[in-house]
Amino acid sequence: MRAVWVLGIDTSCDDTGVGLVRDGKVVVNLVASQVRLHEAFGGVVPELASREHLKALPLLVERALAEAGLRPKDLDLVAATRGPGLIGALLVGYTFAKGMAFALDRPFYAVHHLEGHIAAAWPEGLPPPFLALVASGGHTHLYEVLDLGRYRLLGATRDDAAGEAFDKVARLLGLGFPGGPEVERLAEEAEEAIPFPVPLRGQEGYDFSFSGLKTKALHLVEKGLPKAALAKGFQEAAIAHLAEVVLKAAKDTGHRVLLVAGGVAANRALQERFKEAGLEVHFPPRGLSQDNGAMIALAAWRRHQRGFPPSPLSLGATAYWPLEEA
């Protein structure tokens, strides 16, 4: 049987992602990072992100096809992130992908960004139901995955996303952007941690909150306390918070399988904490934690294999799109 090739594109925020998947296996995963561009501003500037996507995307698609030894007409499916995300950035990749699908007369799949993250951590052959934690710079959501395309939101952040909190604390500490890897690196230098309170202990639900940790970090920075110990304390509290909420949900639902996806999933201390939790835990392969196009191609391939119909080309991109409605 002839192989099925899927092109996936993600421009939901500040990374231009292009991936190629062959029969559910990632063959090419290219990401054009805008970190240096936005670093001076301490965060993503939406208009600049959109302009950079316009520059990078055509070249990245051309390079991906060349690396796989493919011509555009060899593609079987084209997919792109429809949302959620920065609408200007989303439109660049989404419109480009729809144009390719139309020109090549190929099926087009509009993919939810968070379903892409879940697909990246979802091993082939793992049956649902299970829990999925998506923790990144823009999202911190805990889902019960009932099946492909069937998700139940258990809890979400009440304020900052986990990755956003890492970025903001990194800025307070005078570190680079994105802040997650920088805080992790600095925390590893500390022998002792300055204690931080773990948020929402004793709550009945499964929500998250990171704004209090950020405020605590600000007060400690103003006191001139050691930065490495501060970073370690913040990271330990943030990870403990994520773990406690997830473990409570696992106990209440009876699920023993957990997927951890999104950029924060690359944090080594977080990985160790969840591995010690007594659950069967799955993380994305190296390179698939951050935003990328390969995860979008994976999600589209799985939908295609399961008989989900392609998306109409008339369907527009959207900044707000609950995963439960995808």
Swiss-Prot record:
The listed locations are: Cytoplasm
**Residues that coordinate or bind Fe cation:** 113, 117, 291
Instruction: Give an example GO cellular component term for this record.
Output: cytoplasm
Q: Catalytic activity annotated for this protein? A: L-threonylcarbamoyladenylate + adenosine(37) in tRNA = N(6)-L-threonylcarbamoyladenosine(37) in tRNA + AMP + H(+)
Tell me the keywords, alphabetical order.
Answer: Acyltransferase, Cytoplasm, Iron, Metal-binding, Transferase, tRNA processing
What Enzyme Commission number(s) does the record list for this chain? 2.3.1.234
Single GO molecular function:
iron ion binding
Give the source's domain of life in one word.
Bacteria
Q: Which positions bind substrate? A: 134-138, 167, 180, 267
Cofactor comment? Binds 1 Fe(2+) ion per subunit.
**Is Kinase among this UniProt entry's keywords?**
no
As cofactor, the record names: Fe(2+)
Q: Name one GO biological process term.
A: tRNA threonylcarbamoyladenosine modification
NCBIfam families per record: gcp_kae1 (TIGR00329), T6A_TsaD_YgjD (TIGR03723)
**General function of this protein:** Required for the formation of a threonylcarbamoyl group on adenosine at position 37 (t(6)A37) in tRNAs that read codons beginning with adenine. Is involved in the transfer of the threonylcarbamoyl moiety of threonylcarbamoyl-AMP (TC-AMP) to the N6 group of A37, together with TsaE and TsaB. TsaD likely plays a direct catalytic role in this reaction.
The similarity comment for this entry is:
Belongs to the KAE1 / TsaD family.
Give the protein name, as stated in the record.
Answer: tRNA N6-adenosine threonylcarbamoyltransferase
What is the species of this protein?
A: Thermus thermophilus (strain ATCC 27634 / DSM 579 / HB8)
Q: What is the lineage of its organism?
A: Bacteria, Thermotogati, Deinococcota, Deinococci, Thermales
